[in-house]
Design a protein with these regions (language model features):
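Glycine-rich phosphate-binding loop plus the immediately following alpha-helix
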Residues: 7-35, 45, 58-114, 119
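Short helix-loop-beta connector
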Residues: 32-36, 151-154
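Short acidic-hydrophobic catalytic motif
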Residues: 55
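Short beta-strand scaffold segments in enzyme catalytic cores
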Residues: 47-52
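Short glycine-aspartate micro-motif
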Residues: 38-42
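Glycine-rich phosphate-binding loops at beta-strand->alpha-helix junctions
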Residues: 154-170
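Short beta-strand-loop/turn "lid" adjacent to the catalytic site in phosphate-handling enzymes
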Residues: 1-4
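Adenine-nucleotide phosphate-binding core of ATP-dependent small-molecule kinases
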Residues: 97-152
Length: 170
């Protein structure tokens, strides 16, 4: 449910990957998946944050609504977005492509590979550091948002996807 009856929020975004990671966690901890309360975050070209308990994905902040990512623009201030679209001269198709594959790190830094961004940071690029740190902060905020849904009663936060291997980001 959203603030406009004509627009619904979709429960899409890396569901197979995050569910598999949650089930792996359950197996490794000798638990039933249905008995786990987890937040699972997919950190790839898009970023999604899921709350999983009772044997299902109970809530999701998808890659359209959540933090910006290597390629996704993520959630944006609505009025600014509408104004930008109106003034840009882009078609709806062009705007959707920009949001899905030319946003995030691509829009700010021209690259979609977090390893390249980390090299930029190692080489002293303060702008790259600002953008990458902002992306990490946005992920942390969305994890907190999902945790608040269950009053913080979470047994683990699981990170998956390529960026999950980054010591800098995680």
């Amino acid at each position: 449910i959203t603030g406009l009856k004509e627009i619904t929020r979709k429960g899409i975004g890396h569901n197979l990957n995050t569910r598999a990671a949650a089930m792996k966690y359950a197996r490794e901890n000798n638990k039933e998946y249905k008995d786990c309360k987890l937040i699972v975050v997919h950190l790839g070209g898009g970023i999604s944050v899921t709350l999983q308990y009772g044997g299902k994905v109970a809530d999701i902040i998808n890659d359209e609504d959540g933090p910006f990512a290597p390629e996704r623009a993520g959630g944006l201030p609505v009025q600014s977005l509408i104004k930008y679209f109106g003034e840009s001269g882009m078609t709806t198709k062009e705007m959707l492509k920009k949001m899905k594959s030319r946003g995030g790190l691509v829009a700010h830094l021209g690259v979609n590979d977090s390893r390249e961004v980390e090299k930029m940071i190692e080489n002293g690029d303060e702008h790259a550091k600002l953008i990458y740190d902002a992306m990490a902060l946005n992920v942390a905020r969305k994890i907190g948002e999902e945790a608040a849904t269950v009053a913080g009663d979470i047994e683990a936060i699981i990170l998956t996807g390529g960026i999950a291997y980054s010591e800098y980001f995680t």
